[in-house]
Swiss-Prot record:
This is Mediator of RNA polymerase II transcription subunit 20. Keywords: Activator, Nucleus, Transcription, Transcription regulation. InterPro entries: Mediator_Med20. It comes from Gallus gallus. GO terms for biological process: regulation of transcription by RNA polymerase II.
Length: 211
């Protein structure tokens, strides 16, 4: 894999989530991007079991995530902590750990949509949902030939501006910790975790935007 930026795109004023996704997709196709299948990223939240919290320890959250790009892996991200990469049956282990972590089932969130290939870029435009309702839009852009974030951020930003306009993001926080080290799949999952947490907290407010 290369270096990836994950961001949220606001819903356009007077448009639905689906209509905004379609407009973004149309802009990509006009640039010459071609559809390359579908993708999905999901996240379930686990919190420290009540028995542990009652002992005076501060409650902690853990996010268990899956990404269709890595079908044999499961990612466990601790709140303000490390990212553990395990095999796909990690979910089964979490059931056995219910004395320590409990699943906050109402908080499951996921992004699903279409993958696009444009030259050396892989773009994923997804609808973020919680339960039956669409809560927002995610855009993931990967520059495939590079593995050092600092070496290609300007190129990533320039490409994102071509179809996102003024909604092009700033540098992701995870880039600040990488400096000149090699980018990894865990860095992408951290960005999705941050995006999902942001969307969980916000009301859907349409804005003027992509033209």
């Amino acid at each position: 894999m290369g270096v990836t930026c994950v961001t949220q795109v606001p819903v356009l004023e007077g448009k639905s989530v689906q209509q905004t996704v379609e407009l973004l997709s149309k802009k990509l196709e006009l640039l010459g991007a071609e559809k390359h299948g579908a993708f999905g990223v999901d996240c379930e939240t686990y919190h420290t079991a009540a028995a542990i919290s009652s002992q005076g320890q501060t409650g902690k959250l853990m996010y268990v995530m899956h990404n269709s790009e890595y079908p044999l892996s499961c990612f466990a991200l601790f709140e303000n902590g490390p990212c553990l990469i395990a095999d796909a049956n990690f979910d089964t282990l979490m059931v056995k750990l219910k004395g320590f972590f409990q699943n906050a089932k109402a908080n499951k969130i996921e992004s699903r949509g279409t993958r696009y290939q444009y030259c050396d870029f892989l773009v994923k435009v997804g609808t973020v949902t919680m339960g039956p309702s669409a809560r927002g839009i995610s855009v993931e852009v990967e520059y495939c030939p590079c593995v050092i974030a600092n070496d290609c951020w300007n190129l990533l930003m320039e490409f994102m501006q071509s179809f996102m306009g003024s909604h092009t993001p700033g540098i992701p926080s995870v880039f600040g910790t990488k400096h000149d080290s090699i980018y990894s799949p865990a860095d992408t999952m951290v960005q999705y975790m941050e995006l999902f947490n942001k969307i969980r907290k916000q009301q859907q407010v349409p804005v003027a935007g992509i033209r």
